[in-house]
C-alpha cells in the first residue's frame, strides 16, 4: 500500500515518487539527497509532507523503543528513570513499569500543553498585521517624547564603552553590576513561573528529538513555505488516549531588521549591521529596551506562535501586540520547535548559527532553491573593498579620533590608532601595486615591508565587534551631516552598510587559510577575496546534520554539487532524484535547430547573415506559427548582444517588420522594466514578443505561465566572460588543483571546459524553466545553436527538458510541427 504522506490533495505520480525518495532517504540514513523537481510540480508541498510524515513516524518509533527496551531508546532524548533507587538489581518488570509511568506522565503533560494552546487559540486572539508600525497602538509601551537637545550635550552616545585590549572584554561598570543584581533578584521573584517555563520547554525538547531546518534564499519563498504548511493535517505521533491533537511546532526565524519593533532604532537605521549594533548597544545601556523581556513574556509569545502556522509578518505583529521583542523571543523558542525556517545566511554562516544557538545535531536540513547554493556560499564568505571606500573610512576614523581621543580609554585609543594604521597600509599597497583586474595577490604580500607585526587582525576584528565602534562612528558622522545639512541627513540615514562594517568583513578574510580562497585586484582599484573551496564552509553543516536535502527546480548538472560541496562523501550515503514534470509529454517539445546553421560563438555572432537573415527569419516564422494570443519569450546571452541585434534590425527596417507582426518588448541594462507592459498586451489577447537577457531581471523568479509564454527561445549559449577577474581566478585554481594532484594538461583542459559549460547550462536551465508552471500549461522550447547537439552540453539540460528533445532539426520541419501542435492545443482547449 502506497503512503499518502498526509498530502492535502491527491498527489500526482511524480509527487509520490519524490516523497517516497525523501522518506526513504531519511529512513535509510542517507547523508545527502539532491532532488530536482521542476517549478510547478508542487515541490514545496512534497518536501514538507514527506519530511514531516517521517518526523512524526520517527517520533512514534522512538517512543515504541522506549517502551520495548525498558526506557532505553537509541537516538532518543527522552529521559526516563535515572533514579538510583531503581537499579539494575530490580526485576525488569519493575523498571519497565516505572519507566512506562514516567513516559505516560510526560505524554499527559504534553496533552495538557496542547490544551493550553487550545485555550489561547479559542480566545480568538487575532494577530493584527495593521499594528505593525502603528504608533497609535494602545498596547504598545508608552515612550517619553524625546525633546531636541543640542549636539554638544549628546556626545556621550557616540562614545564606546571602555575597552580592555588585552582581555578584549568590556569593563563592567557599577551601573551594569547593579543591573545584573536587579536581574538576579527579579529572577528569584519569578522562580515559580520560571519553573513552569522550564517544564514546558524541557518537555518540548524531549518530545521533539529531531528538528527540520528549512532554508531558502528569499523572504517570499519562506513565506510560501508557511502558507503551504497550513494545508496538510498530520496525525499525532502519540496514542490518542494521551495526545489527540499534536500541533506542528513551527517557528520562522528572521533578522533584527525584519523583526525589530523599537522605533527608536528602526526609524534611524536601515542597514542590517547598524540595526544589530544599535540593538546590542541599547540592551547594554542602563534603560535597556522596553520590549526585551525574558522568561514568562517570551514563553507567552512562544505559546501564541505554536497555536498555528505563522509567517514572519505574523511574528512581527504578534510582538507588537504583546509588547515582546519578536527577534529575541523567537531565538528563545528554537529549542522547543519541530520545524524552523530560516534564510540562507543564518544556515550557511557557522558564526551566525552559534550566536543564535542553532544546533543542527541530528536534524534534517532542507535547502530549497538550492541551484544557487554554491554561489551563495561563495558570496557569503567573500569580501570586497575599494580604494575609495578605504580612504573614506580612514577619514571618518580620523575625524572621530580627533574629536573624542581625550575621552577614550587606553584600549579604545590604541585600537583606533591601529585601525587607522591598517587602513593606511591597505591604501598604500593598492596605490603601489594595482596593475589590472584579475591580478592575484597574497595576504602576506600586503604586509611585507611594513610594521604590521604590531597589528593583530583577530584582535582588531574583536575590537570592532565588541566595542560596536562602527555603529558609534556612523552615528557620529550622521549627526554631523544632520547639523550641517538636514536634507543630506535623509540620504546618509538611509545609506547602506556603514563602511567600517565592510572593512571588518574584509579584515576577517585576511585571516582565512590560503588554500580556501584567493585575493585579487578588480577594476576601480579594488581588492576582492573570493572563496574557492565552498566544501570547507559547508562541512560543519554536513558533519552535524542527520541528513541534508538539497532541492530545486533546476539542479542539473548535479555533479557540480558533489565536486564543490561534498567531494569526500561516500556514494552510498547519498541519493539523487530528478522527477519528471507533471505535464503530459505532448505539452512540451524541445527543439535543437541545426538548419540553418545557428552558431553564436564570440567570433561568429555578429555575422550580418546570422543576425539579419537567419535569426530574423526565425523570429518571423515563429511569430506566425505561435498563436497570436500566446506570447514568445526569447533569451539572449548578454545585454550588449541583445542591444547589438536590436540596433542592427532598427538600422535596416527589420525591427519594424517584426513589430508589425508582434509588438516587441526588450530588456535593457539601464532601461525600465518591460514586463508589465508585455503582460498587459498578452492579457488583452494581442500578439507580443519579449526579448530578455540570461542572468537579467527576467531570467529568474518570474512566472511566464499560460499565454505569457507559449514559446521560449534560447539564443546561443550564454557562456560567461572568461576574461573577468573572478573567472580567471577560479580557472587558475582548478588548473593548479588538478596539476597538484597529478593530473595532466589534458585533464586540466577537460576540467576547465566542463567548468564553463556548467556555468552556462545552469543559466540555460534557469531561463527555460520559466515556461511551464502547472499541469495544464504547455509550451515549446527552441534552442538556437548547433552546439546544443553536443552530448556533453545536452546532458547538462534538466532531465524533463532533455527527455522531450524532438528528432526534427530543420527549421522548416520544426515550424510545421509547431504549427500542428499549437492548432491541436487550441482545438482541445
Curated annotation (Swiss-Prot):
<dbReference type="GO" id="GO:0007064">
    <property type="term" value="P:mitotic sister chromatid cohesion"/>
</dbReference>
<feature type="binding site">
    <location>
        <position position="260"/>
    </location>
    <ligand>
        <name>[4Fe-4S] cluster</name>
    </ligand>
</feature>
<dbReference type="GO" id="GO:0036297">
    <property type="term" value="P:interstrand cross-link repair"/>
</dbReference>
<keyword id="KW-0131">Cell cycle</keyword>
<dbReference type="InterPro" id="IPR002464">
    <property type="entry name" value="DNA/RNA_helicase_DEAH_CS"/>
</dbReference>
<protein>
    <recommendedName>
        <fullName>ATP-dependent DNA helicase CHL1</fullName>
        <ecNumber>5.6.2.3</ecNumber>
    </recommendedName>
</protein>
<dbReference type="InterPro" id="IPR013020">
    <property type="entry name" value="Rad3/Chl1-like"/>
</dbReference>
<comment type="function">
    <text>ATP-dependent DNA helicase important for chromosome transmission and normal cell cycle progression in G(2)/M. May have a role in changing DNA topology to allow the loading of proteins involved in maintaining sister chromatid cohesion in the vicinity of the centromeres. Has a specific role in chromosome segregation during meiosis II.</text>
</comment>
<dbReference type="InterPro" id="IPR014013">
    <property type="entry name" value="Helic_SF1/SF2_ATP-bd_DinG/Rad3"/>
</dbReference>
<keyword id="KW-0547">Nucleotide-binding</keyword>
<keyword id="KW-0347">Helicase</keyword>
<dbReference type="InterPro" id="IPR010614">
    <property type="entry name" value="RAD3-like_helicase_DEAD"/>
</dbReference>
<dbReference type="Pfam" id="PF06733">
    <property type="entry name" value="DEAD_2"/>
</dbReference>
<dbReference type="InterPro" id="IPR027417">
    <property type="entry name" value="P-loop_NTPase"/>
</dbReference>
<dbReference type="GO" id="GO:0046872">
    <property type="term" value="F:metal ion binding"/>
</dbReference>
<dbReference type="InterPro" id="IPR006554">
    <property type="entry name" value="Helicase-like_DEXD_c2"/>
</dbReference>
<keyword id="KW-0539">Nucleus</keyword>
<keyword id="KW-0411">Iron-sulfur</keyword>
<keyword id="KW-0479">Metal-binding</keyword>
<comment type="similarity">
    <text>Belongs to the DEAD box helicase family. DEAH subfamily. DDX11/CHL1 sub-subfamily.</text>
</comment>
<dbReference type="GO" id="GO:0034085">
    <property type="term" value="P:establishment of sister chromatid cohesion"/>
</dbReference>
<dbReference type="GO" id="GO:0051536">
    <property type="term" value="F:iron-sulfur cluster binding"/>
</dbReference>
<keyword id="KW-0408">Iron</keyword>
<feature type="binding site">
    <location>
        <begin position="37"/>
        <end position="44"/>
    </location>
    <ligand>
        <name>ATP</name>
    </ligand>
</feature>
<dbReference type="GO" id="GO:0000785">
    <property type="term" value="C:chromatin"/>
</dbReference>
<dbReference type="InterPro" id="IPR006555">
    <property type="entry name" value="ATP-dep_Helicase_C"/>
</dbReference>
<dbReference type="InterPro" id="IPR045028">
    <property type="entry name" value="DinG/Rad3-like"/>
</dbReference>
<dbReference type="Pfam" id="PF13307">
    <property type="entry name" value="Helicase_C_2"/>
</dbReference>
<dbReference type="GO" id="GO:0003678">
    <property type="term" value="F:DNA helicase activity"/>
</dbReference>
<feature type="short sequence motif" description="DEAH box">
    <location>
        <begin position="368"/>
        <end position="371"/>
    </location>
</feature>
<keyword id="KW-0067">ATP-binding</keyword>
<dbReference type="GO" id="GO:0016887">
    <property type="term" value="F:ATP hydrolysis activity"/>
</dbReference>
<keyword id="KW-0413">Isomerase</keyword>
<dbReference type="GO" id="GO:0003677">
    <property type="term" value="F:DNA binding"/>
</dbReference>
<dbReference type="GO" id="GO:0005634">
    <property type="term" value="C:nucleus"/>
</dbReference>
<dbReference type="GO" id="GO:0031571">
    <property type="term" value="P:mitotic G1 DNA damage checkpoint signaling"/>
</dbReference>
<keyword id="KW-0238">DNA-binding</keyword>
<feature type="binding site">
    <location>
        <position position="279"/>
    </location>
    <ligand>
        <name>[4Fe-4S] cluster</name>
    </ligand>
</feature>
<keyword id="KW-0378">Hydrolase</keyword>
<feature type="binding site">
    <location>
        <position position="289"/>
    </location>
    <ligand>
        <name>[4Fe-4S] cluster</name>
    </ligand>
</feature>
<dbReference type="GO" id="GO:0005524">
    <property type="term" value="F:ATP binding"/>
</dbReference>
<feature type="domain" description="Helicase ATP-binding">
    <location>
        <begin position="1"/>
        <end position="433"/>
    </location>
</feature>
Amino acid at each position: 500500500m502506497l503512503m499518502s504522506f498526509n498530502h492535502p490533495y491527491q498527489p500526482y505520480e511524480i509527487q509520490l515518487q519524490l516523497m517516497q525518495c525523501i522518506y526513504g532517504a531519511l529512513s535509510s540514513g542517507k547523508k545527502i539527497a539532491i532532488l530536482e523537481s521542476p517549478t510547478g510540480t508542487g515541490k514545496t508541498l512534497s518536501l514538507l509532507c514527506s519530511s514531516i510524515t517521517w518526523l512524526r513516524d520517527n517520533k512514534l518509533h522512538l517512543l515504541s523503543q522506549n517502551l520495548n527496551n525498558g526506557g532505553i531508546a537509541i537516538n532518543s532524548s527522552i529521559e526516563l528513570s535515572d533514579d538510583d533507587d531503581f537499579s539494575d538489581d530490580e526485576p525488569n518488570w519493575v523498571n519497565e513499569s516505572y519507566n512506562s509511568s514516567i513516559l505516560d506522565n510526560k505524554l499527559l503533560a504534553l496533552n495538557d500543553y496542547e490544551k493550553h494552546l487550545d485555550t489561547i487559540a479559542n480566545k480568538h486572539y487575532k494577530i493584527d498585521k495593521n499594528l505593525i508600525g502603528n504608533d497609535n497602538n494602545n498596547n504598545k509601551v508608552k515612550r517619553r517624547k524625546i525633546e531636541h537637545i543640542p549636539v554638544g550635550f549628546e556626545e556621550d552616545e557616540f562614545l564606546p564603552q571602555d575597552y580592555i585590549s588585552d582581555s578584549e572584554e568590556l569593563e563592567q561598570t557599577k551601573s551594569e553590576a547593579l543591573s545584573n543584581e536587579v536581574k538576579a533578584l527579579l529572577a528569584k521573584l519569578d522562580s515559580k513561573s520560571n519553573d513552569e517555563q522550564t517544564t514546558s520547554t524541557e518537555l518540548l525538547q524531549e518530545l521533539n528529538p529531531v528538528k527540520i531546518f528549512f532554508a531558502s534564499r528569499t523572504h517570499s519563498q519562506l513565506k510560501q513555505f508557511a502558507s503551504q504548511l497550513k494545508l496538510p493535517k498530520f496525525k499525532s505521533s502519540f496514542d490518542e488516549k494521551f495526545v489527540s491533537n499534536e500541533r506542528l511546532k513551527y517557528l520562522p526565524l528572521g533578522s533584527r531588521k525584519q523583526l525589530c519593533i523599537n522605533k527608536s532604532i528602526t526609524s534611524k537605521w536601515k542597514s542590517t549591521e547598524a540595526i544589530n549594533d544599535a540593538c546590542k548597544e541599547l540592551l547594554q545601556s542602563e534603560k535597556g529596551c522596553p520590549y526585551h523581556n525574558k522568561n514568562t513574556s517570551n514563553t507567552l509569545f512562544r505559546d501564541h506562535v505554536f497555536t498555528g502556522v505563522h509567517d514572519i509578518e505574523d511574528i512581527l505583529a504578534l510582538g507588537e501586540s504583546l509588547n515582546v521583542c519578536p527577534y529575541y523571543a523567537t531565538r528563545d523558542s528554537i529549542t522547543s520547535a519541530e520545524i524552523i525556517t530560516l534564510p540562507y545566511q543564518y544556515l550557511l554562516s557557522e558564526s551566525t548559527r552559534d550566536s543564535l544557538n542553532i544546533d543542527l545535531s541530528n536534524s534534517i536540513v532542507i535547502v530549497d532553491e538550492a541551484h544557487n547554493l554554491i554561489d551563495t556560499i561563495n558570496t557569503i564568505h567573500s569580501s570586497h573593498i575599494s580604494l575609495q571606500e578605504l580612504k573614506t573610512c580612514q577619514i571618518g576614523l580620523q575625524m572621530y579620533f580627533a574629536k573624542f581621543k581625550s575621552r577614550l580609554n587606553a584600549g579604545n585609543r590604541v585600537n583606533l590608532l591601529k585601525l587607522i594604521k591598517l587602513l593606511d597600509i591597505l591604501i598604500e599597497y593598492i596605490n603601489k601595486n594595482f596593475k589590472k583586474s584579475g591580478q592575484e595577490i597574497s595576504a602576506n604580500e600586503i604586509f611585507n615591508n611594513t610594521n604590521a607585526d604590531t597589528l593583530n587582525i583577530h584582535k582588531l576584528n574583536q575590537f570592532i565587534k565588541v566595542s560596536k565602534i562602527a555603529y558609534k562612528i556612523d552615528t557620529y558622522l550622521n549627526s554631523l551631516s544632520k547639523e550641517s545639512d538636514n536634507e543630506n541627513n535623509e540620504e546618509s540615514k538611509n545609506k547602506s552598510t556603514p563602511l567600517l562594517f565592510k572593512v571588518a568583513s574584509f579584515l576577517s578574510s585576511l585571516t582565512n587559510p590560503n588554500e580556501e580562497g584567493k585575493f585579487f585586484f578588480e577594476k576601480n582599484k579594488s581588492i576582492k577575496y573570493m572563496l574557492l573551496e565552498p566544501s570547507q564552509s559547508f562541512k560543519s553543516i554536513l558533519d552535524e546534520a542527520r541528513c541534508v536535502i538539497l532541492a530545486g527546480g533546476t539542479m542539473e548538472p548535479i555533479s557540480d554539487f558533489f565536486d564543490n560541496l561534498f567531494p569526500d562523501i561516500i556514494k552510498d550515503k547519498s541519493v539523487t532524484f530528478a522527477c519528471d514534470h507533471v505535464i503530459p509529454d505532448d505539452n512540451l517539445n524541445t527543439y535543437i535547430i541545426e538548419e540553418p546553421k545557428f552558431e553564436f560563438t564570440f567570433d561568429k555572432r555578429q555575422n550580418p547573415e546570422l543576425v539579419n537573415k537567419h535569426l530574423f527569419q526565425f523570429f518571423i516564422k515563429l511569430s506566425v506559427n505561435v498563436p497570436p494570443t500566446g506570447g514568445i519569450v526569447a533569451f539572449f546571452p548578454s545585454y550588449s548582444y541583445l542591444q547589438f541585434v536590436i540596433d542592427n534590425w532598427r538600422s535596416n527596417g527589420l525591427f519594424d517588420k517584426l513589430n508589425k507582426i508582434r509588438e516587441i518588448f526588450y530588456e535593457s541594462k539601464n532601461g525600465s522594466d518591460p514586463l508589465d507592459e508585455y503582460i498587459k498586451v498578452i492579457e488583452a489577447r494581442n500578439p507580443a514578443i519579449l526579448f530578455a537577457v540570461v542572468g537579467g531581471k527576467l531570467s529568474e523568479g518570474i512566472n511566464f505561465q499560460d499565454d505569457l509564454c507559449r514559446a521560449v527561445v534560447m539564443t546561443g549559449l550564454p557562456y560567461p566572460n572568461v576574461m573577468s577577474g573572478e573567472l580567471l581566478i577560479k580557472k587558475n585554481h582548478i588548473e593548479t588543483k588538478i596539476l597538484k594532484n597529478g593530473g595532466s594538461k589534458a585533464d586540466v583542459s577537460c576540467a576547465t571546459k566542463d567548468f564553463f559549460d556548467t556555468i552556462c547550462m545552469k543559466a540555460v536551465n534557469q531561463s527555460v524553466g520559466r515556461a511551464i508552471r502547472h499541469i495544464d500549461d504547455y509550451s515549446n522550447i527552441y534552442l538556437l545553436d548547433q552546439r546544443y547537439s553536443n552530448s556533453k552540453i545536452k546532458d547538462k539540460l534538466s532531465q524533463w527538458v532533455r527527455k522531450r528533445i524532438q528528432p526534427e532539426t530543420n527549421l522548416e520541419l520544426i515550424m510545421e510541427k509547431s504549427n500542428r501542435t499549437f492548432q491541436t492545443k487550441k482545438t482541445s482547449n
